[in-house]
Amino acid sequence: MANKKLAFQDIILTLQGFWSKQGANLMQAYDNEVGAGTMSPYTFLRSNGPEPWGAAYVQPSRRPADGRYGENPNRLFQHHQFQVVLKPSPKNIQELYLQSLAALGIDALEHDIRFVEDNWENPSMGCAGIGWEVWIDGQECTQFTYFQQVGGIEVDSVTSEITYGLERIATVIQEVDSVYDLEWGNGVAYGDIFKEPEYEHSKFAFEESNQELLLKLFGEYEQEALDLLDKGLVHPAYDYILKSSHTFNLLDARGAVSVTERAGYMHRVRTMARKVAKTFIEERAKLGFPLLKDEALREKYLGKKGKYTKIVEGEEK
């Protein structure tokens, strides 16, 4: 462990510097409610298709059912993920991850770091992959995944995703038991910034949300997303899919949907997710997959017998 314990904001800056040197583009948090960094278009959309891609970004992640009124030391309505996606996956990705921990002052020789097999899936978004939870000193701090399917579509090129739970990483580094005792930066505590919002969002999610309004909004967001997809407007449509997903999560936290209804709502979100993923690939194919520079791969996907040639030629919809 380094002598000076990194503040929360310095952890972010350190990870940004590390992954930028590994070829990741430093993106900003997506400006829509999401439950995980995976749901940002910088991961969800870009993981499909054959184009190479690298991104790293902080993503505030809202999970209404996990709210605990600011009273639980490590369970939150909103937490922060540091998301890294590299496509195609580097062969030494696990070693790079361990190097990133070392950059944070977490020495593998001084800490108990374990990769625990945990094949990951997000059923509502049609995502799945093989992977591991990474436990540091007895608590899960990172999810490590090789994507196999995104939006219900088998990927062309395997994307490696590393999702750091920033609050948990920070409690290891700063050696505190409660996230609210973390130093965010410049002497300001995490609790000074986020404890009151945690209480208010929890009260809203569990007690005060308007169920009738949320049910209406889900249907309207869903219809808007489908209408936009029919017009080929992928990115606005995806925004409304994210709104639909978050609205469902609010309904679920409020106990407003039965077990049977829950499965139905998840199916509706998954249907939209599959359609937007497919439409995004078609959009990129028609543009000629501009980020794909490897000629052999261009031939494989866009050549005479290429996988996406019919889409480009307008023979497939």
Curated annotation (Swiss-Prot):
Annotated organism of origin: Lactococcus lactis subsp. cremoris (strain SK11)
Subcellular location: Cytoplasm
Family named by the database record: Belongs to the class-II aminoacyl-tRNA synthetase family.
GO-annotated molecular function: ATP binding; catalytic activity, acting on a protein; glycine-tRNA ligase activity; transferase activity
Record keywords: Aminoacyl-tRNA synthetase, ATP-binding, Cytoplasm, Ligase, Nucleotide-binding, Protein biosynthesis
Disulfide bonds, paired cysteine numbers: none
Catalytic activity: tRNA(Gly) + glycine + ATP = glycyl-tRNA(Gly) + AMP + diphosphate
SUPFAM superfamilies (UniProt xref): Class II aaRS and biotin synthetases (SSF55681)
Keyword Ligase listed: yes
Broad class of where this protein is predominantly found: cytoplasm
GO CC terms in record: cytosol
GO terms (BP aspect): glycyl-tRNA aminoacylation
EC number(s) per entry: 6.1.1.14
Pfam families documented for this protein: tRNA-synt_2e (PF02091)
Stored PANTHER family: GLYCINE--TRNA LIGASE, CHLOROPLASTIC_MITOCHONDRIAL 2, GLYCYL-TRNA SYNTHETASE
InterPro entries named among the record's database cross-references: aa-tRNA-synth_II/BPL/LPL, Gly-tRNA-synth_heterodimer, Gly-tRNA_ligase_asu
Classification via NCBIfam families: glyQ, PRK09348.1
Domain of life: Bacteria
Subunit record text: Tetramer of two alpha and two beta subunits.
Protein name: Glycine--tRNA ligase alpha subunit
